[in-house]
Amino acid sequence: MEVWYGAEQVPASLSAPGGPGAVVTMGIFDGVHRGHQAVLGRVVELSHELAHGDRRPLAVAVTFDPHPRSVHQPEADLPLIASLTDRLASLGDLGLDAVLVITYTLDFAAQSPQDFVRTWLEELLGARAVVVGDDVRFGWRNSGDAATLEQIGRQDGFEVEIVSTICSDEGRRWSSTWIRQCLKDGNMRQVSRVLGRPHRLRGVVVRGLRRGRELGFPTANLEAA
């Protein structure tokens, strides 16, 4: 999977006449949980469905860093489930061709929904189709939603597919908020359930109090990265 940090790293051939174009989704994808995986999996499927011979649109996810809430509400001190490095690693496990990482700033956030879609998805990525969850919000003050995207798609000639909310057996929506609460509560079994895989923790091994030698098996102290 390729990672493009900013528009300048996106190959011009992607959206050029005769280029493959892309099937695109967009989101923070903090944790890359089961709900995210449903949308991302459909992106990969649709990219193959739209292939003609050996010409296939790339399956591309657009994500943002830093987290928008940390830009708009820096005092909130939002705990992230995963670093950008771990987020990209999880995205790379899903069969995507590329991820575009956009630096999120207040200037970027000031774009209208129409400007965002046309500048970044259509002109830059050559979007042939856009796949999103039914709770998608984008553009100035989150004024764009699924209906907005469908309207732009009809006007500009690209396909839009809305993936319905995916819920647990008890009817709760898989979400990053749920994972953060489980992490706060120390409920790692539930964290793994919502993620659909074990939770990753990255850090540097540091010297501890050497109590592990008293337990009869090796231990490691991690300083969270």
Show where each model-derived region lies.
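General small-molecule cofactor/ligand-binding pocket signal
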Residues: 2-4, 99-102, 159-163
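Active-site cores that bind ATP or allylic diphosphates and position pyrophosphate for catalysis
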Residues: 118, 122-225
